[in-house]
Amino acid sequence: MTTAPAEHGRATAVPRLAPAAVFLQGLADQDFATVGGALAADAHLRALLPKGLREWSGAEAIGGQFAHWFGDTEDFELVEATAGQVGGRLQLRWRLRLRAGRLGAGWFTVEQQAYADADASGRLVRLDLVCTGYRPEVGDGRRHD
């Protein structure tokens, strides 16, 4: 995972990225309790998915949704993750490769990008996310749109 401190490298930028780092590490480890633990109890997720806009409220519901998306896999790999700041908001991006029977045969890649706000306790309270959906990897004989 890479992080890009804001404020031109000032030491104060790193603690602001800590909530993003905890969230991304939980995701990398497929530890959805840690993902949920990075969120405030009243957190809200708004996600633009291939099937449309969806919303979830509460750390438990949001953590459960990430478990639904990225749990129950035969193989799982965090390819890339970054965290930074844009206009005072946290910016998180991750790309995953996974194989899961529920998706069909072969490897799939998915990338998500989120902008988030943290509360004074360092937990994420709001995430606005966009997702590519599960994309079959090139060379697996499938048609790609």
Please name every model-derived segment.
Residues 27, 44-45, 107-108:
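Short hydrophobic/aromatic segments of transmembrane alpha-helices and their interfaces
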Residues 2-11, 67-145:
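A beta-strand edge to alpha-helix "cap/lid" segment located at domain peripheries
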Residues 23, 35-36, 43, 58, ...:
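Hydrophobic pocket/interface hotspot
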Residues 20, 27, 39, 62, ...:
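Hydrophobic alpha-helical core bundles mediating ligand binding, dimerization, or RNAP-core interactions
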Residues 34, 38-87:
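A solvent-exposed, acidic/Ser-Thr-rich amphipathic alpha-helical stretch
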Residues 15, 19, 61, 108:
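Soluble or luminal CAZymes and related metallo-dependent hydrolases
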Residues 1-41, 144-145:
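Short, low-complexity N-terminal intrinsically disordered segments enriched in polar/charged residues
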